[in-house]
């Protein structure tokens, strides 16, 4: 079974380097895996200002963040392949990659995988949940050819 992914990528940033649409599709498809037969996903790449506004509005944190996940929640009687939206702040991803001594590509891949797992219901609030999510993220990221995103540099 392979995933039929309808991916909408929105560029709302002036960042110098962004992954290709093909990279975004590969990373999202890898994260979603066999969880769904088909999925519709929007990835919106934003600047710090938009990220800060959304983070403040939806999480009560008045600062930009790397990735926000907005799962689509349909009524139980309606079956739609809408997975949800990811909003990724290019400037935060770039800064974190530099601080963590990772390549931009590796950190972008991690943010897409991380965000997609949130859309699938994974979380990292409780220690046990965090352990499960981080383990799956590491497995997926390493499967894409990158190093463990949680390994100390």
Curated annotation (Swiss-Prot):
InterPro entries (UniProt xref): MetalPrtase_cat_dom_sf_prd, YbeY, YbeY_CS
Reported cofactor(s): Zn(2+)
GO cellular component annotations of the record: cytoplasm
Keyword Zinc tagged: yes
Transmembrane parts of this sequence: none
Family: Belongs to the endoribonuclease YbeY family.
Protein name, as recorded: Endoribonuclease YbeY
Origin organism lineage: Bacteria, Pseudomonadati, Pseudomonadota, Gammaproteobacteria, Alteromonadales
């Amino acid at each position: 079974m392979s995933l039929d992914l309808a991916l909408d990528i929105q560029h709302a940033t002036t960042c110098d380097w962004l992954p290709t649409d093909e990279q975004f599709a590969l990373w999202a498809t890898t994260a979603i895996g066999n969880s769904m037969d088909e999925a519709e996903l929007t990835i919106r790449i934003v600047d710090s200002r938009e990220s800060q506004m959304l983070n403040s509005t939806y999480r009560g944190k008045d600062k930009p963040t790397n990735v926000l996940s907005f799962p689509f929640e349909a009524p139980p009687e309606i079956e739609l392949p809408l997975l949800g939206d990811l909003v990724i702040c290019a400037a935060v991803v770039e800064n974190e990659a530099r601080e963590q001594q990772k390549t931009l590509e590796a950190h972008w891949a991690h943010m897409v995988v991380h965000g997609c797992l949130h859309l699938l219901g994974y979380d990292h609030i409780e220690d046990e949940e965090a352990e499960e999510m981080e383990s799956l993220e590491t497995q997926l990221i390493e499967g894409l050819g990158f190093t463990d995103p949680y390994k100390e540099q």
